[in-house]
UniProtKB/Swiss-Prot annotation:
Protein name: Glutamate decarboxylase 2
Primary subcellular site in the record, as a coarse category: cytoplasm
Annotated function: Catalyzes the production of GABA.
EC number: 4.1.1.15
GO annotation terms (biological process): gamma-aminobutyrate shunt; gamma-aminobutyric acid biosynthetic process
Lineage: Eukaryota, Metazoa, Chordata, Craniata, Vertebrata
Alphabetical UniProt keywords: Cell membrane, Cell projection, Cytoplasm, Cytoplasmic vesicle, Decarboxylase, Golgi apparatus, Lipoprotein, Lyase, Membrane, Neurotransmitter biosynthesis, Palmitate, Phosphoprotein, Pyridoxal phosphate, Synapse
Native organism: Sus scrofa
UniProt family annotation: Belongs to the group II decarboxylase family.
Binding site residues for substrate: Q181, L182, S183, R558
Any one GO molecular function term: pyridoxal phosphate binding
Residues carrying Phosphoserine: S3, S6, S10, S13
Location of region: Disordered: 1-24
Intracellular or extracellular location(s): Cytoplasm, Cytosol; Cytoplasmic vesicle; Presynaptic cell membrane; Golgi apparatus membrane
Chain residues carrying a lipid of type S-palmitoyl cysteine: C30, C45
Length: 585
């Protein structure tokens, strides 16, 4: 006999599940009962299940149960079909939602309750009295809840509980006191755009399935190229899954530009290629070289000065060394806003060297690209207009929700030639519209998420001036922090001088270490301070800031600010909290 749910009236089974006491039978009858309107279905379900028979998640402790949606409605229709009518999620499953027959009412109610959960989380994210994180160790979370996937479906009441539980233990990255990563903040327009994008649920490979999004990508990338300084916004570009992939795109295109035959014949057809980047650059350059078969040994790290900027004379020296060995320099990746120090390489000097030796110049402005929106700070990227390609991540300094990373290329058509494969089932050549808007073939991906809409909608809502105010405020907050701690007892700066970006790097020195000479023992003990304070931050949930060693410098705090919700008071709180958590070390 068919199992419950396999047919409209099929509820029994060979194993005795036709017994009215059996929960599987009750669920099957309940699905039929939900076809009735006016609350009758829910009442029948309640009789079938009984309070003791409601499905419950097995294993582990349970979060508080969500209350069933029991709203009143004034439509005066009998029976009532509007979303405000009573819906009891304990007796509903995903199969009762659209596209199920009569699934509109439970669908609207369910999504409204999900929205309520999300909106409560949004409000809490900006509430300074709430924790940034409710930290639990991995084994605690694994033991406390049953996260395993089951063969049988759970009801919608439990699904809502999973939503609540997930957010309960999520990091509030929009919290004004979350300073841990380069991507922070929670923009309301960007959030709304992301919801819309998920609702549209389309792919970016052709105009026919994403007409508006493809046009918005064209408009937005052109505007970004104009801001970089390429005449008329000429060139090409694409949104990618992140800065690491954007940097790999640049490496891929630079290699193709110099040796187009590599596309068909592979690395065996080309000489030993060498890329150059600073010792403070992002690790993604080496990852890209590994993925493309170039090899990490073929990425030469150029020395930096004490502020983390590439030294041009060392770049030229290493280029000449590579050429003397018979290798072929094909790419220099300069960084505009390094991950740790927030340093900006001297782009004009790097551009001169690249021009002299005919090498592709890439600028990794994933972190620093946002400063191009500020008239006060864009000078730090002087020379970016001479680059052949630029990585720019609006999901970092501009506060666009993750993910939103762009790779901009100065030469139009090069990306298409490098990556296109002419898949005839997608990119037919006899379509009835302009095929230049079928942009998917220039991407490495086939399935590509719509990342542009949140940036475009935020830009429309804020204007360029709004982004400028955002950038200027964050840099002012970084300067405020620097001015407070540079001469404050118990703090030592990692490098001298005002930071160029919002990165403020410092050591907190507890009272017990302040009396020690600056020797190996002191450095060894100091290296343990930041990790302990960070652990205490997370366990208390009050704030979060990152730390790391770099070169010969032991663990230090790296404070970054990209959330415009932060204030001077939040900076003051951070300083006081570090001192409170570290004074006994």
């Amino acid at each position: 006999m068919a199992s419950p749910g396999s047919g409209f009236w099929s509820f029994g089974s060979e194993d005795g599940s036709g017994d009215p006491e059996n929960s599987g039978t009750a669920r099957a009858w309940c699905q039929v009962a939900q076809k009735f309107t006016g609350g009758i279905g829910n009442k029948l379900c309640a009789l079938l299940y009984g309070d003791a028979e409601k499905p419950a998640e097995s294993g582990g402790s349970q979060p508080p149960r969500t209350t069933s949606r029991k709203a009143t409605c004034a439509c005066n229709q009998k029976p009532c079909n509007c979303p405000k009518a009573e819906v009891n999620y304990a007796f509903l499953h995903a199969t009762d939602l659209l596209p199920a027959c009569d699934g509109e009412r439970p669908t609207l109610a369910f999504l409204q309750d999900v929205m309520d959960i999300l909106l409560q989380y949004v409000v809490k994210s900006f509430d300074r009295s709430t924790k940034v994180i409710d930290f639990h160790y991995p084994n605690e979370l694994l033991q406390e809840y049953n996260w395993e996937l089951a063969d049988q479906p759970q009801n919608l009441e439990e699904i809502l509980m999973h939503c609540q539980t997930t957010l309960k233990y999520a990091i509030k990255t929009g919290h004004p006191r979350y300073f841990n990563q380069l991507s922070t903040g929670l923009d309301m327009v960007g959030l709304a755009a992301d919801w819309l994008t998920s609702t549209a649920n389309t792919n970016m490979f052709t105009y026919e399935i994403a007409p508006v999004f493809v046009l918005l990508e064209y408009v937005t990338l052109k505007k970004m190229r104009e801001i970089i300084g390429w005449p008329g916004g000429s060139g090409d570009g694409i949104f990618s899954p992140g800065g690491a992939i954007s940097n790999m795109y640049a490496m891929l295109i630079a290699r193709f530009k110099m040796f187009p035959e590599v596309k068909e014949k592979g690395m065996a057809a080309v000489p030993r290629l060498i890329a150059f980047t600073s010792e403070h650059s992002h690790f993604s350059l080496k990852k890209g070289a590994a993925a493309l078969g170039i090899g990490t040994d073929s990425v030469i790290l150029i020395k930096c000065d004490e502020r983390g900027k590439m030294i041009p004379s060392d770049l030229e020296r290493r280029i000449l060394e590579a050429k003397q060995k018979g290798f072929v320099p094909f790419l220099v990746s300069a960084t505009a806003g390094t991950t740790v120090y927030g340093a900006f390489d001297p782009l004009l000097a790097v551009a001169d060297i690249c021009k002299k030796y005919k090498i592709w110049m890439h600028v990794d402005a994933a972190w620093g690209g946002g400063l191009l929106m500020s008239r006060k700070h864009k000078w730090k990227l002087s020379g970016v207009e001479r680059a052949n390609s630029v990585t720019w991540n609006p999901h970092k300094m501009m506060g666009v929700p993750l993910q939103c990373s762009a790779l901009l290329v100065r030469e139009e058509g090069l990306m298409q030639s490098c990556n296109q494969m002419h898949a005839s089932y997608l990119f037919q050549q006899d379509k009835h519209y302009d095929l230049s808007y079928d942009t998917g073939d220039k991407a490495l991906q086939c399935g590509r998420h719509v990342d542009v809409f949140k940036l475009w909608l935020m830009w429309r809502a804020k204007g360029t001036t709004g982004f400028e105010a955002h950038i200027d405020k964050c840099l002012e907050l970084a300067e405020y922090l620097y001015n407070i701690i540079k001469n404050r007892e118990g703090y030592e700066m990692v490098f001298d001088g005002k930071p160029q970006h919002t990165n403020v790097c410092f050591w907190y020195v507890p009272p017990s270490l302040r009396v020690l000479d600056n020797n190996e023992e002191r450095m060894s003990r100091l290296s343990k301070v930041a990790p302990v304070i960070k652990a205490r931050m997370m366990e208390s949930g009050t704030t979060m800031v990152s730390y790391q060693p770099l070169g010969d410098k032991v663990n230090f705090f790296r404070m970054v600010i990209s959330n415009p919700a932060a204030t001077h008071q939040d900076i003051d709180f951070l300083i006081e909290e570090i001192e409170r958590l570290g004074q006994d070390l």
